[in-house]
Amino acid sequence: MGQAPGTHWYHAHKHGSTAINVANGMTGVFVIEGGYDDALNDFYGKGWTRTQPVLVINQIGVTPNLERGGGGRTDKGPNFSVNGRIRPVMAMAPGEVKLWRIANTSGRAGMFLTGIFAAGPQGPCYGAAAGFQWKQTAQDGVQLIDANYQASRNPTLTMMAGNRVDLLVMAPATPGTYSVCVQNMVDPSDLATQQKTTLFSVKVAGTPASGAAAQFIGTAPPFPAFLAD
């Protein structure tokens, strides 16, 4: 077997220019299918995984030498793009489950997923929790065993540069537009000073999902033999 199944990423690798190229967005994601996808498609429907969103995160506005000038600054850089767009909008039906394959391909910045929120008086990320549910199924291209999948309910996630996460995400029953909110971080101590920012929005509208489309798969996809050791 060559590369193991999972969500993987790539970047330009010209020696001497790699950091500059990655900072300028020369990155991408590729998915290798295997038994993991087969199990999800058996539950959600033939070809379902091929219709699910792949979210490639890039940091925007960094300088090629990655320096931040001035003493006493607390910001860790600018916001992020998602598939080359700033704060795009994803559509979901009420109660629908989607598989989000998220890859942080930033040149430097980490990304702390704080949650999914309705708008509040202080801004899009400072309202009430929106009622989304999510369960993690894979990390860095490696699927989780069932015990970890079962224990993973609405986890907060830290994605440093190069990290990938697969999440099954269930939309709330209430229609509306909600913000997926993150904090830009390099070190955990940054979280005390970094404001929440909208990574992208989810518009929940239309006919409510039903059947398997509105359920989490009961058990994680079977763990492959090549990972058993």
Region roles according to the model:
Residues 14-16, 35-42, 85-87, 97, ...:
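Short alpha-helical segments and helix-capping/turn motifs at coil-helix boundaries
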